[in-house]
């Protein structure tokens, strides 16, 4: 249900990727007092103070300036030219040439991600019926051509609020109501389309007006959290002085240019070609394409989709489709609270972090190998999606997938039963927003033995809920042999590190250094090492030179807890890294080093990266977390 994930996205906290705006548990809430304190600090320091890190400054062993080796010395900072403004096209212009793609898209969840209210777009019953939750009445009704909701407002008094936009399509639909300051807020009472009923997304909560989890609260704001992945060409346009929004977008849905990029030059090319001439001066690809999927390859395609189908921090105000991901986003790691220790999804993490753990991702399998690109539905029904590759004669691109898998000898379940479905064992679903099951895209082999040892979930007892994990682990051993239990898994080391067990840091450092591990796993290992200043120094230093930018960014953060004499030579070259996420991580990790301990070239590079860090936080001043980061 990839289409559902994007069309139902609710976690868009730029500065704090763990914030989930609509269905977030109270355990992760931020007290309103912290917001006030953070704002006050920012006003005092004007947002320019640099944080000293999680530990006090570590003195450099020598009074001499610390510089990296000559071969790695950064070049003087070069002003980066502002990119040319994107040339957007009218979304309707695409259908003239791409009629079949447009037809498939019109029926997709992407097309219905956000719509103006109308008889066709509103699924909920606005017929005067009333829904009650925790003593609050919410009534849905129409007046003339307006869809209205009567419920408690920010002051706690009942008021009538007009639906400005629908949000999502199936299995649920929410409604955006407008508050002063250009704020669009998703009502927490949503429409359950399959059951034709209203329901509350937080049934166990009573968030009063003024609470950040009340539907009018700051952490329920769709301008900050949601709309960028429900629209095309979103511009948040937050005014920090007025604490207001003037948000705009090119199209109120996930349209062609959300994935293919601004199409103005491509339309110019198409019109010129139709007129019998070519435009030789078009920039970029020969057809004026902003994103050329044929040239991107499997992993490049995943990065385009991951712009929204991921839990991540936004680094720029206007991310460019098809640009290197870590220039515009910092993906969340497999941290506690988001993922189980073995990498299974826990919180709303939106597919990508799971998929990048998988063997399929490493083999180059792209999203469109399983999902039709424009309808976003599965390309084949049921197990046929999997057996196009996992078969005796697989797709020639993936010869390692050869084998007979859709058989009882493999899955050990009755043919045609629920247990015989590939996804039942390899993509167990977790339900979010109360009614939306989302399959885990790590496509893992079930490991009930890990459930026994570290308490993680497993697909077997998700179905056989009346059976213990050991029963399932014993069955797997009988079927596939004892070797399955002896296969090492990073989850064991991560679970030990999360619990602070002796010796865990050494095991985590070994994972960070293991190039065979997925980059998101190695980045998570490096993140865990931050709490262990004496462990894994070699792994951190080596990771700073890794080919993978996600690993380099995590290494920069992990190096912060090392003595300055050790970390500075590794961090200074990262100030000139090609990718923004790495540069600002290095700047943050060097902020506690006295400037006089750096040579002039290193100071200049640090100044440039620190300015970039301020710019990144300024993108998210609507989120108190960004203001807090600037202040400390």
Language-model regions: role of each:
Residues 1-22:
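N-terminal intrinsically disordered, acidic low-complexity segments at the extreme N-terminus
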Residues 32-51:
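Hydrophobic alpha-helical membrane-insertion segments, chiefly the h-region
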Residues 69, 74-78, 100-168, 172-179, ...:
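Primarily the internal scaffold of c-type cytochrome electron-transfer domains
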Residues 502-513, 533-545, 563-575, 596-614:
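Amphipathic alpha-helical scaffolding segments comprising HEAT/armadillo-like alpha-solenoid repeats
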Residues 516-518, 547-549, 578-579, 623:
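Short inter-helical turns and helix N-cap capping residues of alpha-solenoid HEAT/ARM repeat scaffolds
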Residues 518, 600-632:
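C-terminal luminal/periplasmic domains and tails of membrane-associated envelope-modifying transferases
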């Amino acid at each position: 249900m990839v289409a559902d994930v994007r069309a139902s996205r609710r976690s868009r906290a730029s500065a704090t990727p763990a914030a989930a705006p609509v269905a977030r548990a109270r355990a992760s809430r931020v007290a309103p007092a912290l917001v006030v304190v953070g704002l006050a600090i920012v006003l005092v320091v004007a947002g320019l103070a640099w944080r000293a890190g999680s530990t006090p400054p570590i003195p450099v062993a020598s009074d001499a300036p610390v510089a990296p080796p000559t071969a790695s010395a950064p070049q003087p900072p070069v002003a980066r030219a502002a990119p040319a403004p994107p040339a957007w096209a009218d979304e309707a212009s695409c259908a003239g040439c791409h009629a079949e793609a447009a037809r498939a898209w019109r029926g997709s969840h992407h097309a219905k991600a956000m719509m103006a209210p109308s008889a066709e777009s509103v699924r909920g019953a606005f017929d005067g019926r009333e829904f009650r939750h925790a003593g609050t009445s919410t009534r849905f009704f129409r007046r003339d051509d307006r869809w209205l909701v009567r419920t408690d407002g920010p002051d706690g008094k009942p008021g009538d609020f007009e639906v400005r936009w629908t949000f999502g399509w199936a299995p649920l639909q929410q409604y955006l109501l407008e508050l002063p300051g250009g704020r669009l807020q998703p009502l927490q009472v949503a429409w359950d389309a399959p059951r034709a009923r209203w329901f509350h997304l937080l049934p166990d909560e009573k968030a009063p007006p003024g609470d950040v989890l009340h539907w009018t609260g700051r952490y329920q704001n769709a301008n900050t959290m949601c709309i960028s992945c429900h629209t095309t060409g979103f511009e948040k346009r937050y005014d920090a002085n007025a604490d207001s929004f003037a948000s705009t977008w090119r199209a109120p849905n996930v349209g062609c240019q959300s994935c293919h990029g601004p199409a103005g030059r491509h339309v110019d090319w198409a019109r010129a070609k139709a007129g019998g001439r070519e435009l030789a001066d078009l920039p970029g690809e020969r057809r004026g394409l902003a994103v050329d999927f044929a040239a991107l390859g499997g992993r490049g395609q995943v990065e385009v989709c991951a712009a929204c189908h991921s839990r991540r921090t936004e680094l720029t105000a206007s991310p460019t489709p098809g640009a290197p991901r870590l220039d515009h986003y910092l993906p969340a790691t497999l941290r506690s609270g988001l993922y189980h220790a073995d990498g299974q999804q826990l919180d709303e993490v939106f597919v990508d972090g799971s998929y990048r753990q998988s063997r399929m991702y490493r083999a180059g399998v792209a999203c469109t190998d399983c999902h039709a690109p424009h309808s976003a539905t599965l390309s084949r029904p049921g197990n046929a999606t999997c057996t196009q590759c996992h078969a005796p004669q697989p797709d020639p691109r993936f010869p390692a997938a050869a084998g007979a898998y859709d058989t009882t000898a493999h899955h050990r379940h009755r043919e045609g039963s629920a247990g015989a479905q590939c996804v039942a064992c390899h993509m167990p679903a977790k339900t979010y927003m109360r009614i939306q099951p989302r399959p885990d895209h790590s496509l893992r082999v079930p490991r009930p033995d890990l459930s026994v040892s570290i308490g993680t979930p497993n697909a077997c007892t998700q179905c056989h809920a009346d059976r213990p994990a050991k029963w399932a682990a014993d069955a797997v051993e009988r079927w596939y042999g004892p070797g399955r239990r002896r296969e090492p898994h990073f989850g064991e080391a991560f679970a030990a590190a999360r619990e602070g067990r002796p010796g865990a840091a050494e095991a985590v450092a070994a994972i960070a250094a293991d190039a065979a591990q997925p980059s998101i796993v190695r980045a998570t290992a490096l993140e865990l090492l931050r709490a262990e200043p004496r462990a894994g120094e070699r792994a951190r230093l080596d990771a700073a030179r890794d080919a993978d930018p996600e690993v380099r960014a995590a290494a920069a953060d992990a190096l912060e807890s090392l003595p300055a004499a050790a970390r500075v030579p590794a961090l200074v070259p990262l100030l000139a890294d090609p990718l923004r996420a790495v540069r600002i991580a290095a700047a943050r990790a060097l902020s506690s080093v006295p400037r006089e301990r750096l040579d002039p070239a290193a100071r200049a590079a640090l100044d440039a990266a620190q300015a970039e860090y301020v710019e990144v936080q300024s993108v998210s001043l609507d989120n108190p977390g960004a203001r807090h980061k600037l202040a400390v």
